[in-house]
Amino acid sequence: MRFRSLIVALVAFFSLAAKPHAKTTAGDVFPDIQHERVDYWVSEFSTDHDYHKKIADGLARKPKYQKMIQRKLRERGMPQNLIWLAMEESAFDSIACSRQKAIGIWQLTPDTARLWGLKVTKKIDERESVEKETDAALRLLTHLHERFGCWYLAAAAYNSGEHRIARIMKKTLGREKGRDRDYYRIWDKLPGETRDYVPAIVALKRIGKDPAKYGF
């Protein structure tokens, strides 16, 4: 299974490398679909002391990377508000490190980073370059969008793994590709963290439109 996953990722990587600015469908957006979990996270981020501090720090760091990320999103025809995925991953902390050894603002693990074109060795770790890690993360997200057909499922796969999301989609809906609302049709089949991953991104996007309204 691991070998097959490696082959799939390598084929996708070299396909995207051949067309480095492959564009998604014009007009694609990461929509704000109303759901109680989005409202829940807006409230949590706004009122919980620890969450509020993390989000406030992230909003303060965001301008440092915003122009670069939005330029790269624009070049690829990707939704500008995918920048909030990085906020959810790391609050734009370039030295953030997880227990799974994911680092950087996009929190790529060593294996994922290598699969999507970055050097990760004992001497060199290109995830430490925000620009290079952004390129790798956007290549991965482009691949996931092409596989699943919408950004909600692509984001879920970014968090939980594409093969898991593919299995859940096939078992629940009989297909891999879907629409953003299908995320909530498979919601109860998702791992706990992934159930709140997309709602949290949408909540951050909502807060980012008017931070003062939410106490930031």
Question: How would you name each of these model-derived features?
Answer:
Residues 2-6, 10-77:
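An acidic, Gly/Ser/Thr/Pro-rich helix-cap/linker signature
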Residues 21-48, 97, 111, 121, ...:
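Catalytic and substrate-binding regions of cell-wall glycan-acting enzymes that process beta-1,4-linked
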Residues 51-66, 75-78, 98-106, 126-137, ...:
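Solvent-exposed, acidic/flexible segments
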Residues 67, 71, 83, 135-142, ...:
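Solvent-exposed, polar/charged alpha-helical surfaces in well-ordered, non-transmembrane soluble domains
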Residues 78-95, 154-159, 202:
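Short, functionally critical alpha-helical segments immediately adjacent to catalytic or ligand/cofactor-binding
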Residues 100-122, 130, 134-141, 175-177:
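Substrate-binding/active-site groove segments that recognize
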Residues 120, 144-155, 175:
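Inter-helical turn/loop segments and adjacent helix faces that build the functional surface
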Residues 209-216:
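Helix-loop elements that line ligand-binding/catalytic pockets
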